[in-house]
Swiss-Prot record:
Induction: In leaves, in response to infection, elicitor, ethylene, or wounding. One of its GO terms (biological process) is carbohydrate metabolic process. Keywords: Glycoprotein, Glycosidase, Hydrolase, Plant defense, Pyrrolidone carboxylic acid, Signal, Vacuole. High levels in leaves. Appreciable amounts in stems, roots, and sepals. Tubers, root tips, and all other flower organs contain very low levels of enzyme. This is Glucan endo-1,3-beta-glucosidase, basic isoform 2. The active site is at E120, E265.
Amino acid sequence: MATSQIAVIVLLGLLVATNIHITEAQLGVCYGMMGNNLPSHSEVIQLYKSRNIGRLRLYDPNQGALNALRGSNIEVILGLPNVDVKHIASGMEHARWWVQKNVKDFWPDVKIKYIAVGNEISPVTGTSSLTSFQVPALVNIYKAVGEAGLGNDIKVSTSVDMTLIGNSYPPSQGSFRNDVRWFTDPIVGFLRDTRAPLLVNIYPYFSYSGNPGQISLPYALFTAPNVVVQDGSRQYRNLFDAMLDSVYAAMERTGGGSVGIVVSECGWPSAGAFGATQDNAATYLRNLIQHAKEGSPRKPGPIETYIFAMFDENNKNPELEKHFGLFSPNKQPKYNLNFGVSERVWDISAETNSTASSLISEM
């Protein structure tokens, strides 16, 4: 067999292995826009494609971003922002209009996978005034998606944070706060009945920075050399798994044992507060990318995970919120991250076949 043919076969094998590797990871990146110096929407989507980032979270139905996503084959979590939740809950006509304008008009050119109705609405935060509208808005959007003929393609959910969890230690004893059960139980029931996952924002950084005396940095960064928490037969070496499994346990306690979880935000700031350093962020992100393929002790298997965020956003507050980006606004990577392909594979593909240029290079 000719050397060139062997090289092509080897390359194809590497490409197949690469695609499996990235699929296992199920990684996405959140596309926030709270900056006055960010690239154009088309540049951003091209950056996702060039880095082989196949999933994206969008916090509102920005028409420029949705148009840029046409034909990209990137899977999208499309946000219905908190400011619209009350309006959507007030009547089906509003839900139908929203779905037509922001979903149906872009389908199937834009691969919307989930609609996140609200972000971190909670009875115990500044969004408490919206809590009574959360489930009605979920139901109305769900019905509107079904009426649009997309009920088998798009799941409707909401994104929550860890403030709803009352007990998280040990993870098997995870439970929702008693004073929010009136809010969380109907959400879990809705997701169970519609077979949709709960979207959860999980930040080991905030748990660590708020309690460094009790939580070690290695445990938060996935670098603990030994088991930190023994929970029955389950062993925990990192805080991410412990937090994730506490939510699974909480849902099981409320009849949601069949409900999956998508980690809809997860990141580490590089500046602006205690523990927020370039080195810590790089370590956390590299390990998160690797760990997303593996699953947690309670739920082994790939974890669909969205890293927060694509860019540093200079209009956010407080200061540390400005420093969660994987990239600077000039599109230069802040970290040497790898979404599943080694530099060697990139070099081989570039030398052997120009059509492999879509392979991800190291970030």
